[in-house]
């Protein structure tokens, strides 16, 4: 038969396994030093932001913090890479929507006489 030590060891392993299956363990993702570093970075960001607000208020008269926040939220997004915007149409789609496209372009663009001094430019491939 099994010795007392073997039975006690098996019983201990079984009890430990049962307790482990019943409990929900928490393993921290970040260490204390990483959390502290993250908090310091956030605090530095806030300090830099408040410093920028103070500099702006000195340069452009007194601005309220709400006005500065609204100004930053409504800011223009500046692109750092070239962006190509275009529309591709097949010949069937072009024939179907030609009148609408010509109307939109005539509203959006000035007449050719104003742009090219009376000369008629080649404006599209379908002409």
Curated annotation (Swiss-Prot):
Plays an important role in the regulation of interdigestive gastrointestinal motility and indirectly causes rhythmic contraction of duodenal and colonic smooth muscle. Belongs to the motilin family. GO terms for cellular component: extracellular region. This is Promotilin. The keyword Oxidoreductase does not apply. Residues 41-67 are annotated as: Disordered. Transmembrane segments: none annotated. Keywords: Cleavage on pair of basic residues, Hormone, Secreted, Signal. It is found in: Secreted. Present in the gut mucosa with the exception of the gastric corpus. Also present in medulla oblongata, nucleus of the solitary tract, hypophysis, spinal cord, hypothalamus, and cerebellum but not in the cerebral cortex. Residues 1-25 form the signal peptide. One of its GO terms (molecular function) is motilin receptor binding. The gene is MLN. The keyword Signal applies. It comes from the Eukaryota. The lineage of its organism: Eukaryota, Metazoa, Chordata, Craniata, Vertebrata. It holds the Pfam family Motilin_assoc.
């Amino acid at each position: 038969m099994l010795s007392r030590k073997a039975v006690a060891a098996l019983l201990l392993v079984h009890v430990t396994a049962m307790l482990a299956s019943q409990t929900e363990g928490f393993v921290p993702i970040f260490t204390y030093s990483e959390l502290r570093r993250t908090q310091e970075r956030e605090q530095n960001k806030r300090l830099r932001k408040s410093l920028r607000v103070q500099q702006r208020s000195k340069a452009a008269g007194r601005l309220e913090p709400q006005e500065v926040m609204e100004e930053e939220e409504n800011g223009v997004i500046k692109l750092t890479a070239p962006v190509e915007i275009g529309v591709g149409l097949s010949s069937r789609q072009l024939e179907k929507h030609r009148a609408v496209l010509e109307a939109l372009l005539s509203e959006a663009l000035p007449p050719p006489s104003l742009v090219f001094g009376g000369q008629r430019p080649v404006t599209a491939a379908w002409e």
